[in-house]
Regions:
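Membrane-embedded helix-loop-helix hairpins and adjacent transmembrane boundary segments
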Residues: 1-566
């Protein structure tokens, strides 16, 4: 049974005290401003570039990465790092081309963008869509995976106690507003990175000790052991499997390819996942929307630079767990692939385990707080103020935002209490990507055409949203029955349940392409220049010398990584 020594508990409590104290200090320092809705929801103009970058990472790297991506590292290997490394390139695109348009047009929420560019109907529909997605997919999965992981480390049956504890910690930070979230995220990221790298270092030492019999254990030798013991786990591009191979190895290859369909994913859903997540997502863009352009750009690029190194923290422990499991060194391993990270943490010595749990908790709490604040922002600014109480003053809006945070957390706890959504069965990381992917194609099509093509109309946007959603359902449930298992658009593969399945990233790619064609066709029936289109000029996209240097460094490192692991 996993238990925590006194020193581990002291380290964990010390982390909690630091975050709570610092958050309260920030709250008290800006207490007079917190009553202003813009400050509560956006921390308008007060976050530095490094705070923006840290907050982006803290909000992004949570249980679905620590637990879910580590699980995919156990199952698939380094190929899952595509989500992190393509994100680095995506953040460059967002910083250079998306953010200038948002800031010039004073966009504070994503539904507001849709109202400004299209119409009220599109904005309202998407506000409701996002609220459901954030509460029932994101909040629930983060809370469930985090509680499962920490419960496994504590030993015993404390799952529901941990859930409530995580909720209360997130509430403590969230109720202080975006400024408190932004600056406490700096501490969260510091703990996350220090604890994450310490965990990886110790995990590699454990591999050397357990597999090679080394007394002290070397992290470098441990890493070399991972490569020699699991070479297939260090390939970025998975080979296309064969549907006729009925062996266990053949089935495993198909199951991996369904999750990450080789080179094809780079021409399909991988870009949609990243560009939609980082550029059209209130939860993420909110960190930069209250800042000046240069500050926002540097913060986003700083986050992109950090993303290059995140697979080391979130993926290598999963591969280490796979090698140990393969060699019979994880006899008590349970929980499927999502149990990989907890299995590694259980090996850590006294003291390090407390630091690792603090890092994991930091990631979970920061992400819960950020997501809850985004839910409150969308509901308060885009639904409550517009439709329920148009005369609401600043204090009333902040009060409503705090109430929304509380209610959303309670709903998330209710649905994760008995895992009503089946998150554990899907695997946490895949659960989020798959079900977010049902609306991503339509949403991203609306944004990309709305930003950069002046003829796009509100009618086309609504049609695109509906088309993207319907097509996602069609490809997931009906395409195989109508078009068969293989055609020019896709190849379906036998999954572990014995049914044919199209890789969801391929589904997303085709849903997006057809949605764009639909929107363009409808827009051609409208005016040549939509009066609601944004004015764009080349000067908006010029970057400073320091910004350009950071972009070049990031691109060089990214290229080197792909050359090494292709």
């Amino acid at each position: 049974m996993n238990t925590l020594a006194l020193s581990d508990k002291i380290i964990f409590v010390f982390y909690f005290i630091i975050v709570a104290t610092y958050g309260y200090w920030v709250y008290r320092k800006k207490k007079n401003d917190v009553s202003a809705s813009q400050d509560f929801f956006l921390a308008e103009g007060s976050l530095t570039w490094w705070a923006i970058g840290a907050s982006l990472i803290a909000s992004n790297i949570s249980a679905e990465q620590f637990i879910g991506m580590s699980g995919e590292g156990f199952f698939v290997g380094i190929a899952v790092a595509a989500y992190e490394w393509i994100a680095a390139l995506t953040l460059i695109i967002i910083a250079v081309w998306f953010i200038p348009i948002y800031l010039k047009n004073k966009i504070y929420t994503m539904p507001q963008f849709l109202k400004t560019r299209y119409n009220e109907s599109v904005s309202l529909v998407m506000a409701i869509f996002w609220l459901f997605l954030y509460v029932f997919v994101n909040l629930t999965s983060i809370l469930y995976l985090g509680a499962v992981a920490i419960n496994g480390l504590l030993g015993g049956d404390y799952l529901h106690v941990v859930m409530i504890g995580l909720m209360l910690m997130a509430l403590l930070i969230t109720l202080g507003g975006m400024k408190v979230i932004g600056y406490t995220d700096v501490i969260q990221v510091a703990v996350l990175i220090i604890g994450g790298f310490a965990t990886v270092y110790m995990a590699l030492q454990i591999v050397d000790q357990r597999i090679n019999g080394a007394l002290a254990g070397s992290a470098i030798t441990g890493f070399k052991t991972l490569i020699s013991q699991a070479p297939e786990h260090f390939k970025m591009i998975l080979p296309k499997p064969n549907n006729t191979d009925m062996s266990a190895a053949g089935q495993l290859a198909r199951d991996k390819y369904i999750v990450l369909p080789g080179i094809a994913m780079y021409f399909a859903g991988q870009w949609i996942v990243n560009l939609n997540y980082w550029g059209c997502n209130q939860y993420i863009t909110q960190r930069a929307l209250g800042a000046k352009l240069e500050t926002a750009r540097k913060g986003i690029l700083f986050a992109g630079f950090i993303k290059l190194f995140m697979p080391v923290i979130v993926m290598l422990p999963g591969i280490a767990a796979f090698v140990l499991y393969k060699n019979g060194q994880l006899p008590g391993f349970e929980g499927g692939k999502d149990g990989a990270y907890s299995a590694i943490l259980a090996f850590l010595p006294v003291g390090f385990k407390g630091l690792a749990i603090a890092a994991l908790t930091a990631a979970i709490v920061a992400s819960l707080a950020g997501k809850a604040n985004s839910i409150a922002t969308i509901f308060t600014l885009d639904i409550y103020k517009k439709y329920l109480n148009k005369l609401a003053d600043e204090k009333k809006m902040v009060w409503t935002g705090r109430l929304t945070v509380f209610v959303s957390m309670i709903v998330a706890v209710i649905f994760t209490w008995q895992d009503l959504l089946g998150i554990g069965g899907e695997g946490g990381f895949t659960f989020i990507q798959k079900y977010t992917g049902f609306i991503s194609p339509g949403v991203f099509a609306m944004f990309i055409l709305g930003l950069f093509w002046k003829r796009t109309t509100g009618t086309a946007a609504m049609a695109g949203l509906i088309t993207g959603f319907v097509l996602s359902i069609f490809f997931n449930n009906y395409a195989i029955g109508i078009f068969g298992t293989e055609n020019i658009m896709y190849t379906a593969y036998l999954n572990k349940s014995g049914a044919y399945e199209i890789p969801f990233l391929i589904n997303m790619g085709w849903s997006f392409v057809i949605t764009v064609v639909t929107m363009v066709t409808i827009s051609f029936a409208g005016p040549k220049v939509n009066p609601k289109s944004f004015e764009i000029d080349a000067s908006m996209f010029k970057v400073s010398k320091s910004t350009l240097i950071l972009i070049v460094i990031t691109l060089m490192l990214l290229s080197a990584l792909y050359v090494k692991f292709w």
